[in-house]
């Protein structure tokens, strides 16, 4: 199966996804990104800790075989392979390592922890189990913990050290290894009087595995939205094998065979039974039913459908059997496009993450340096400056008894070397680069998933961050603030030509156009039962009009300036109506007056944005009087309207606003909005808009409702707030806990951490970040329930 390669507009530039197993912290991410960026031909790299994917942009002329990328990654000690399918509907949710295996490791570690603890409890209760109070017994337990449930962690840590890319596992290896080696020395040479740390490796690995198992479950839950989307695609369907030989009226009862959905092709006929999801985008050729389209469109009520209607993959057939001719299958369906957009959004990093990445890239080196300094300081200067710390007990340590058993008492004094070793180990295991690495991607993962559930497709975490900072919203008029369903209310002839012929010419020039004004002219011609005529040499100029030849006449249809006909005075119409002018080479021929209605939710959306301190403007290519009339209907002042603007001038207007320091969001739907959408800090396109507008936008509102703008803005602000909370926690945790573990509070307050407690703190830290990101689901849904419905 070919690798999932996506070619960009640049023929020499290629993007590919690489699955990377074994990454545990931000240090792992930084190591992979650094190694790939050093590879000749690689242009850009983005590695996601949550999805365990690396997106690599590279020059295909310099890298002919992309497996060289996986070779570079495996050289760091990680397992890597190219993603082998570009159909997002067939891709499993990353779950590495499997939760089942991790739970087994946790169960073994918990058993060892209980057995180890029982020796202490039995000693306290004066009823120890035979042998459990012996240090050799605990030495064997520690070996079992290290080589059993802890083996994968220690192996990954050693690989990181060996390859020059130390990570979280490397810190655990150094901490547990140091504790165990020191304990062996104490066990083999009891005359040294050293304390044994034999319970520390067991407790430390138990806490770490508990934290990672809970963290893995939380990660899996954070991908719930993507899982829900994937679940909309059935695996099999009923395929009609020879539909051409079956009469149309017999298609519903024709025999069918079970067929894998992944093997369907355009032109296939499928039967869809009641209670089954539709597997393809296509057209109904037999039957009528009702469909549940809520997951894709947000429409809560079942929608009737009949022969000739188009349906989308993932919608649920509710009542009767249907036969559908497939038009788009697999990766070409609308559902696949949504899943792909969500997956790509989760892969793209928010700018705020660069700060965490900059720290995490050298975090492990810094921790190792702090641990070394801690050991050196307390072994020499610290114990001399504050000798009283040597008289303080070190809680949780096992000490030698003369009979090679163990006690839970503490010696009255410790050697400086013992104190230094204890604190250095605590520094190694308390540090948490995991929290830094998880702070941003977990929040983005949850936020983009929530957005998808609301029919909002976000291009990436960077778009969410930009949207959260937006305070200036600019709306296109036609099809955005209005319904885009124009009605021709008047034909005003300006020359001696039959009005029906004028309408035929206008409809011919606008044939095949999706613009709302064009649709209105075509609909009016059909309603008048006018025979369609052909137009040749048609040429569309976005935002201005269209030209062509009809009945031997060279015609232009569009705004009066563009049709370039000198006239003393243009006729006037309704202030709220939109005009389209038809002219030939000599004169104006007609003016078509069309009227549109505002979207029902437009006024409330505009007022809701303004009530939250946002500035709202209208930017339109329509007449000034028409745009101002709409603004007044929406409660906006005439000063907020900029009308009669060409497409390139729209982009210039957005650029001018942003040059004043304002981050601007542009909401539009047409071809003429594409330059402005691309220029704005955040471009927002409605689903009914043109393909060019959708491609230029960072946000796509698939439910084609303006209130989705409010939902997206609210979600982006909540998501950014969650990211900041996560980063504050991750940084604050390390800023506080590293000095505490290093003994900074030991002389004055007698506060320090044992390695086991340090390991527990580390596990709790990363779990707190993931849990806080999951809370975003709760707070967002609560905000939806308490927000004003528009």
Curated annotation (Swiss-Prot):
Predominant cellular place of this UniProt entry's protein: membrane
Extracellular-side positions: 126-134, 190-193, 381-416, 750-753
Cytoplasmic side: 1-105, 155-166, 212-357, 440-726, 777-790
Annotated EC: 7.2.2.9
GO annotation, cellular component aspect: plasma membrane
Positions of Cu cation binding: 25, 28
Keyword Transmembrane: yes
Pfam families found in the cross-reference section: E1-E2_ATPase, HMA, Hydrolase
Key words, A-Z: ATP-binding, Cell membrane, Copper, Copper transport, Ion transport, Magnesium, Membrane, Metal-binding, Nucleotide-binding, Phosphoprotein, Translocase, Transmembrane, Transmembrane helix, Transport
Transmembrane portions of the chain: 106-125, 135-154, 167-189, 194-211, 358-380, 417-439, 727-749, 754-776
Protein localization: Cell membrane
Keyword 4Fe-4S annotated: no
Active site: 476
Membrane topology per record: Multi-pass membrane protein
GO terms of molecular function: ATP binding; ATP hydrolysis activity; copper ion binding; P-type divalent copper transporter activity
GO biological process per UniProt: copper ion homeostasis
CDD domains the record matches: HMA (cd00371), P-type_ATPase_HM (cd02079)
Family membership noted in the UniProt record: Belongs to the cation transport ATPase (P-type) (TC 3.A.3) family. Type IB subfamily.
Name of the protein in question: Probable copper-transporting ATPase SynA
Lineage of the species this protein comes from: Bacteria, Bacillati, Cyanobacteriota, Cyanophyceae, Synechococcales
Gene: synA
């Amino acid at each position: 199966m070919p690798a999932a390669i996506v070619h960009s507009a640049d023929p020499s530039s290629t993007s590919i996804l690489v699955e990377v197993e074994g990454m545990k912290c931000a240090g792992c991410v930084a190591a992979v990104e650094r190694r790939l960026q050093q590879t000749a031909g690689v242009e850009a790299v983005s590695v996601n800790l949550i999805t365990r994917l690396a997106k690599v942009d590279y020059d295909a002329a310099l890298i002919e075989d992309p497996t060289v990328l996986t070779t570079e990654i495996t050289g760091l000690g990680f397992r890597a392979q190219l993603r082998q399918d570009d159909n997002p509907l067939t891709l499993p949710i990353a779950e590495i390592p499997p939760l089942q295996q991790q739970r087994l490791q946790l169960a073994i570690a918990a058993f060892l922890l209980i057995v180890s603890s029982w020796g202490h409890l039995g000693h306290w209760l004066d009823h120890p189990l035979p042998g459990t109070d012996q240090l050799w017994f605990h030495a064997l337990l520690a070996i079992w913990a290290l080589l059993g449930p802890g083996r994968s962690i220690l192996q990954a840590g050693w690989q990181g050290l060996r390859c020059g890319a130390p990570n979280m596992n490397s810190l655990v290896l150094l901490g547990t290894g140091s504790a165990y080696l020191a304990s062996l020395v104490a066990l083999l040479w009891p005359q040294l009087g050293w304390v044994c740390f034999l319970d520390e490796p067991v407790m430390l690995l138990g806490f770490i595995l508990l934290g990672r198992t809970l963290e893995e479950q939380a990660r899996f839950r954070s991908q719930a939205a993507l899982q829900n989307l994937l679940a909309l695609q059935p695996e099999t369907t009923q395929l009609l094998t020879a539909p051409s030989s079956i009469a149309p009226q017999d298609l519903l009862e024709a025999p069918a065979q079970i067929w894998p959905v992944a093997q369907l092709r355009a032109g296939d006929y499928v039967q869809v039974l009641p209670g089954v999801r539709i597997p393809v985008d296509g057209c109904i050729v037999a039957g009528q039913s009702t469909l549940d389209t809520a997951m894709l469109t947000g429409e809560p009520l079942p929608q009737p459908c009949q022969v000739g209607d188009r349906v989308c993959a993932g919608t649920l057939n509710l009542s009767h059997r249907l036969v559908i001719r497939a038009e788009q299958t697999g990766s070409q369906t609308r559902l696949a496009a949504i899943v792909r957009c969500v997956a790509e959004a989760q892969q793209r990093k928010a700018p705020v993450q660069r700060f965490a990445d900059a720290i995490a890239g050298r975090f492990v080196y810094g921790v190792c340096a702090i641990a070394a300094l801690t050991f050196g300081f307390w072994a020499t200067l610290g114990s001399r400056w504050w000798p009283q710390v040597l008289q303080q007990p070190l809680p949780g340590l096992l000490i030698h008894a003369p009979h090679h058993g163990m006690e839970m008492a503490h010696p009255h004094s410790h050697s400086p070397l013992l104190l230094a070793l204890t604190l250095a180990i605590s520094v190694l295991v308390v540090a948490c680069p995991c929290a830094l690495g998880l702070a941003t991607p977990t929040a983005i993962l949850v936020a983009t998933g929530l957005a998808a559930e609301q029919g909002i497709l976000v291009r990436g975490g960077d778009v969410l961050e930009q949207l959260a900072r937006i305070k200036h919203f600019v709306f296109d008029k036609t099809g955005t603030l209005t319904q885009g369903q124009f009605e021709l209310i008047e034909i005003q002839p300006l020359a001696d030509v039959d009005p029906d012929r004028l309408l035929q010419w206008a409809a011919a020039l606008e044939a095949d156009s999706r613009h709302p004004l064009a649709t209105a002219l075509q609909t009016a011609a059909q309603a008048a039962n006018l025979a369609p005529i052909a137009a040749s040499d048609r040429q569309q100029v976005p935002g201005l009009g269209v030209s062509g030849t009809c009945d031997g006449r060279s015609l232009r249809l569009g705004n009066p300036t563009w049709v370039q006909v000198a006239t003393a005075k243009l006729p006037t119409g309704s202030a709220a109506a939109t005009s389209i002018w038809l002219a030939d080479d000599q004169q104006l021929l007609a003016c078509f007056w069309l009227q549109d209605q505002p979207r029902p939710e437009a006024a409330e959306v505009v007022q809701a944005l303004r009530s939250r301190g946002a500035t709202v403007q209208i930017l339109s290519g329509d007449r000034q009087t028409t745009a101002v009339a709409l603004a007044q209907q929406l409660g906006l002042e005439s000063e907020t309207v900029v009308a009669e603007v060409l497409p390139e001038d729209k982009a210039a207007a957005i650029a001018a606003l942003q040059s004043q320091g304002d981050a601007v969001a542009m909401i539009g739907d047409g071809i003429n909005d594409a330059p402005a959408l691309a220029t704005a800090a955040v471009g927002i396109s409605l689903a009914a808009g043109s393909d060019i507008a959708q491609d230029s936008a960072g946000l796509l509102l698939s439910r084609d409702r303006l209130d989705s703008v409010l939902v997206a803005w609210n979600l982006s602000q909540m998501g950014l707030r969650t990211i900041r909370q996560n980063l504050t926690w991750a940084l604050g945790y390390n800023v506080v806990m590293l000095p505490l573990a290093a003994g900074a509070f030991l002389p004055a307050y007698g506060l320090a951490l044992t390695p086991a407690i340090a390991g527990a703190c580390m596990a709790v830290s990363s779990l707190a970040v993931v849990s806080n990101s999951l809370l975003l689901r709760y707070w967002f849904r609560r905000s939806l329930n308490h927000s004003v419905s528009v």
